[in-house]
């Protein structure tokens, strides 16, 4: 169950990243990495 939520969240982050990347690639990439790291820490336990 948690794995499914984690996958769906990652897909949403990826979609958002692709949209933001057109504007400012460096900043959006760092933001997504931070969010992914935070989510992986939450769901990794």
Curated annotation (Swiss-Prot):
Has potential application in preventing biofilm formation on medical devices, since it has the ability to prevent methicillin-resistant S.aureus biofilm formation on the polyethylene terephthalate (PET) surface, which is widely used in making prosthetic heart valves cuffs and other bio devices. Residues 11-35 form a propeptide. Transmembrane segments: none annotated. Residues 1-10 form the signal peptide. The lineage of its organism: Eukaryota, Metazoa, Chordata, Craniata, Vertebrata. Disulfide bonds: none annotated. This is Temporin-SHf. One of its GO terms (biological process) is defense response to bacterium. It is found in: Secreted; Target cell membrane. Non-amphipathic alpha-helical antimicrobial peptide with potent activity against some Gram-positive bacteria (including methicillin-resistant Staphylococcus aureus (MRSA)), weak activity against Gram-negative bacteria and no activity against fungi. Permeabilizates membranes through a detergent-like effect probably via the carpet mechanism. More precisely, it strongly and selectively perturbs anionic bilayers membranes by interacting with the polar headgroups and the glycerol backbone region of the phospholipids, hence disrupting the acyl chain packing of the bilayer. The modification Phenylalanine amide is found at residue 43. One of its GO terms (cellular component) is membrane. The keyword Membrane applies.
């Amino acid at each position: 169950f948690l794995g499914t939520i984690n996958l769906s969240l990652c897909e949403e982050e990826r979609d958002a990243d692709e949209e933001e990347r057109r504007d400012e690639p460096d900043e959006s990439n760092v933001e997504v990495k931070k969010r992914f790291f935070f989510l992986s820490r939450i769901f990794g336990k």
